[in-house]
Amino acid sequence: MNSEKKSYALVTGACSGIGYQFARALAARHYCLVMVSNRDKEIHEAATRVAGDYGVDTRPLCLDLARPTAARELLDFCDGLDVEVLINNAGVFSFADVSPRTPPFLELILGLHVETLSKLTVLFGERMKQRGGGYILNSSSLAGYFAFPGISLYAATKGYVRLFSESLWYEYRPHHVTVMALCPGAVATDLYGLPTFYQNLGVRLGIICRPEKMVDKALNRLFKGRRVYIPYPLLNVPMKWMMELLPSGLIRFIYQKVKRFQK
C-alpha cells in the first residue's frame, strides 16, 4: 500500500483491547486511520498515541455505534476519504442468564453486533467496489460455533457475524473486496470480565492469546484473501468440535465454574 495515496483504515472499538491493537498494526502498515469508540476521552488519547508513534493521520470519532443511525453517520464522517480497510471490531459481552432484565442489553448487542456491523459492511463494501477493491474484517468469535449457557445472546450474534461474513466473501470476491470473519477463542482483554490474574495465567498456559499477536496474524490472513480465520487453530479448532459433543450435564457443570471467575 502506497502511503502517499492516503488510504485509510476504519477501526471501530479502537480505544482499547483488540481494536486498539488493530489500529496500531494498520498504522505500522502505513495506513491512515479513522478510530471510533463511544468513549470520547479515551479515543482521542488513543488516536494521539498512534499518530505520535507511527506518524500517520488519525481521525478520532466518539460515536454510539448501537444507534440505528450510527452507520450512516460514520459513512458521512468518512466522506472524501479513501477507506480501503474496515475493521468491524466494536462489541459487548455479558455472561448472564436471560431474564426479564435482558431486553435493554438485547437491543444493545443486536445494535452493535448485527445492525450496525451489517450496515457498515454493506455501505463501505459498496464504496470499496467502486474504488476497485478493499478489505473488511468482521469480528466474530469461536463462541459463534456452539451453544453455551450464559452467553446465549453473545454466541447467537457472533454466529450471525460469521455466516454473514462468509456469505459476503463469495458475493464481494469478484469485485476484489475481501470479507473475512475473525473467530478467536479466549483473548487477554477486559471485555470478558476475567480478572487480570487469570488472563495472565491463561496466556502462560497457552489457552489465551495476546491481542497484539492475534491481530498481526489476522491482518496477514485478511490481506491474503482468507474467508475465515480461527487463531491458534491447533487449540481452537478441536475446542470448537469438542464443545459441540459435550453432554449437557458437563456443560452445566462448566457453566457454574465459569460464573465464579466473572467480576
Where are these regions (language model features)?
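Active-site helix of classical SDR
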Residues: 121, 157
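Residue(s) in the substrate-gating loop at a strand-loop-helix junction
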Residues: 141
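Conserved glycine-rich cofactor-binding loop
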Residues: 13-17
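Conserved glycine-rich Rossmann-like NAD(P)H-binding loop of the short-chain dehydrogenase/reductase
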Residues: 29-45
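The beta1-alpha1 cofactor-binding region of Rossmann-like NAD(H)/NADP(H)-dependent oxidoreductases
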Residues: 41, 61-73, 103
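Conserved mid-core segment of classical short-chain dehydrogenase/reductases
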Residues: 76, 85, 93-107, 150
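SDR active-site lid
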Residues: 170-235
